[in-house]
Amino acid sequence: MGTAQVLPGILQKHCCILPDRNTESQCTLCGEPEEEEAGDLVQPGISFPGPAEEDLDPQYSWSPTQHFNEERYSPAPRSMKGLSGSRTQPPLCSGHTCGLAPPEDCEHLHHGPDARPPYLLSPADSCPGGRHRCSPRSSVHSECVMMPVVLGDHVSSSTFPRMHYSSHYDTRDDCAVAHAGAKINRIPANLLDQFEKQLPLHRDGFHTLQYQRTSAAAEQRSESPGRIRHLVHSVQKLFTKSHSLEGSSKSNANGTKADGRADDHHHAHHAKHSKRSKSKERKPEGKPRPGMSSWWSSDDNLDSDSTYRTPSVLNRHHLGPVAHCYPDALQSPFGDLSLKTSKSNNDVKCSACEGLALTPDAKYLKRSSWSTLTVSQAKEAYRKSSLNLDKPLLHQDAKPALRPCHYLQVPQDEWGGYPTGGKDEEIPCRRMRSGSYIKAMGDEESGESDSSPKTSPKSAILPEPLLKSIGQRPLGEHQTQTYLQAASDVPVGHSLDPAANYNSPKFRSRNQSYMRAVSTLSQASCVSQVSEAEINGQFESVCESVFSEVESQAMDALDLPGCFRTRSHSYLRAIQAGYSQDDECIPMMTPSDITSTIRSTAAVSYTNYKKTPPPVPPRTTSKPLISVTAQSSTESTQDAYQDSRAQRMSPWPQDSRGLYNSTDSLDSNKAMNLALETAAAQRHLPESQSSSVRTSDKAILVSKAEELLKSRCSSIGIQDSEFPEHQPYPRSDVETATDSDTESRGLREYHSVGVQVEDEKRHGRFKRSNSVTAAVQADLELEGFPGHITTEDKGLQFGSSFQRHSEPSTPTQYSAVRTVRTQGLFSYREDYRTQVDTSTLPPPDPWLEPAIDTVETGRMSPCRRDGSWFLKLLHAETKRMEGWCKEMEREAEENDLSEEILGKIRSAVGSAQLLMSQKFQQFYWLCQQNMDPSAMPRPTSQDLAGYWDMLQLSIEDVSMKFDELQRLRLNDWKMMESPERKEERKVPPPIPKKPPKGKFPITREKSLDLPDRQRQEARRRLMAAKRAASFRQNSASERADSIEIYIPEAQTRL
């Protein structure tokens, strides 16, 4: 009890941080009242010798340590990890939340092997010893968290409500049962209120975090979804309010959580890492927090019992049986998950306790509670409860590998769908809330990447068995895949089958396009670590407050998301405001050794961001996407379409690889995207398709496209853009050619994010979607003109029309034109792709023919007023005018006409010829451009209609002249003029007689004076009427056009 003397002061700070906690009973160490009787912090059923009981601050010693027999579980974890479990740092009594060297009675806690069986705190001891460094921060939850480690030792009857454990090593059940007893009953009201009020609920907050999935977990679960949801909303608000504070709070809360988790040696190891990472996370240190990777897993947030379980869930996979094996994995989760609010329990739970309970059980702890606490609340709670948050930082230092896991410690309440390892475990309200997202993650990547990203940094640290047992990698991949799937809905689904319990379909339906865009960007960035530094910096700056400790690895994992954020600061702000949690969740899976996970992580984090962004206007979404994927967006879309075409039209699959035309066209974007894709391809050499998409020969791309068509691993870009729930897999197939596997697809997603988002938002206007439309048009054109396009890679990709129109000899030119057109100054082509009988049109230019073919291909808009239709009108009008001119010229030759009449004839013919040679020609080219999907300034049908209306004025003017000539001819070429005109003409005749040339114009002017006035009046009326009609048409269609035009422009601009 030598430490008992020192402990009081610290315990006063830590154990007694929250009056509520200390009101229950006195902390033996600090003398503050403890919640023992209520069981909030006291671990029910944990009996310690008088000293132990005293030493252990029931409030702060989340009886997980008490429950856990260190002998049973602690030894292996310690020896295995040797971080927090093995090294008995100042032997903090698990019972002592003080985090100080525990009293003598706490020895059992300190030494798992030495732990007395009566003290189920033994496992926690190792954790307290190793973990309690963070404990000082919030020793209550930290130590308590540690307790659940030894589920076997845990006493289900222990007073510590959270410490109720089934005799078996139930991952969540341990903590859930332990805290379920009294804590759940008591803490929920107190802690929930406190957290909701942002009151420092250190112990309660930890209690909430300690919320388990056992009987208590079930109870909490039932109430946690609504309660946690409410808490999550509150936390999100707090999170938004205190992004900057979140960094510190996260660090503190995470560190504390790590402490709490240290109870379990496995957890203790992770707790240590998490402590460091957590404290860093909670603190705006900009350091990646290993716990973050654990924290960031949606599982953490999804688990209503313990958000901290994300890593712990991962660890828990194998931790129950291999509790010692995944201390590493748990450390990060613990540190990250230190402070969480249980859905059912308003109090903050000890993430460590939850993690401890969690670890034994393969099930994933519910993570909604922590997300409720999340950064802002946990931050405050940790500030008050974790005086020694710096200690976790030390642990975090020891857990550098876990820092990547710390990338995103944002509560994943919205992400709830990260059942880290517990696919079997349903994600309570979190999953329900973000079920679609979770399902997106869970369906394809849940099993693979749920935990993988979390322990990605740890994966190096953790033994492969640990990773496997914990299933962290698969979880990380699942998460990554989930995000990718959310981004590229289709591929993710099959990829995340292991985590099918994540019902991501709705989430995917919400965010899948946006997530795809994000994933595409994130993956592109993650894939090309080239942009990692850049994205890291961006991401840091944007999310530093939120991801203070995510710096090193969160940045790596979220490098592309950083770019994405850079792309869309407004979106970033929105994410930080409401989706920081998502971001924080993302990083934990980012560092996973799985490149796909990293990409997915980035993509996921944006996917989560997308959850809100999807509402963001396509322009906003497109801009951010385009910033990174401006070119890739186009090219992804184009690629996807061309892949689709290539797949459908094997003749030019390689050409479909001309996808990278847009890359060529967009140098900066191309450089970035190429780097990203190249990096992705390099990372996924097996998926050389990715690099081949950009860099590899088209043959590879074609083969990959074919493979992807088979595998449905579509490039997210196009898939997402056009995919928006409508053609998820068709696009997917198209892009599938681009990306052979999900990771490649992730790259694709990044590339075509802009288009994806844009198309998703306006998929209804998909035909008018510029980027997507251009790409689709190219695809259709290519299909329509396989013969034409197969010869030119880029041209083929975007269709012969692109080649024809831009006539770039180089793929880059095509790509540039195509990209610009695709992103679309004009969406005309689709609108104007009316099935036109080319025979009726004037001979179209070579490039025009493919456009016609495209129209025939079926890409023409339902509206027949497209370029072909106007060309028909123009052709008919030209023939009519030419007939008039020929007729009048013949009349002038055959008849001896007066100069005045000849002047009229010349005027009419000249006007007609001028009209035909200039305006008609201009309109003709406009129509051709409209039909040319590759036309950079592709006019819309509304543009053509407006121009045609203008032409009608000139045509009417010329027609009036010819009508007058016709009347003169019918009058035997005798001037038939009204008296006024005759009078006027009498005056002018001398002028006409003077110089024929001068006379001609003068005569024309005078002769046209009255008619001109009349014509001008009629013209004005006609113009007004036509303008009104055209305005209505244009306003109706141009709203979409302008949106499409501007959205693509937004994409092109950024």
Swiss-Prot record:
Membrane topology: Peripheral membrane protein
Biased composition (Basic residues): 267-281
Alphabetical UniProt keywords: Cell membrane, Membrane, Phosphoprotein, Synapse
Location of the region described as Disordered in the Swiss-Prot/TrEMBL record: 32-87, 242-301, 442-464, 609-666, 719-746, 977-1021
Biased composition (Low complexity): 289-299
Subcellular location: Cell membrane; Postsynaptic density; Synapse
Phosphothreonine PTM positions: 738
One GO term describing the cellular component: plasma membrane
Composition bias type Basic and acidic residues, residue spans: 977-987, 1002-1020
Listed Pfam families: GKAP
Modified residues (Phosphoserine): 298, 304, 386, 452, 662, 665, 668, 715, 740, 771, 806, 978, 1007
Tissue specificity annotation: Expressed in brain and kidney.
One GO MF term: molecular adaptor activity
InterPro entries: SAPAP
A Gene Ontology biological process term: modulation of chemical synaptic transmission
Positions with biased composition (Polar residues): 242-255, 628-641
Function statement: May play a role in the molecular organization of synapses and neuronal cell signaling. Could be an adapter protein linking ion channel to the subsynaptic cytoskeleton. May induce enrichment of PSD-95/SAP90 at the plasma membrane.
Annotated PANTHER family: DISKS LARGE-ASSOCIATED PROTEIN 2, DISKS LARGE-ASSOCIATED PROTEIN DAP SAP90/PSD-95-ASSOCIATED PROTEIN
Family of the protein in this entry: Belongs to the SAPAP family.
Subunit structure, as described in the record: Interacts with DLG1 and DLG4/PSD-95.
Protein name: Disks large-associated protein 2
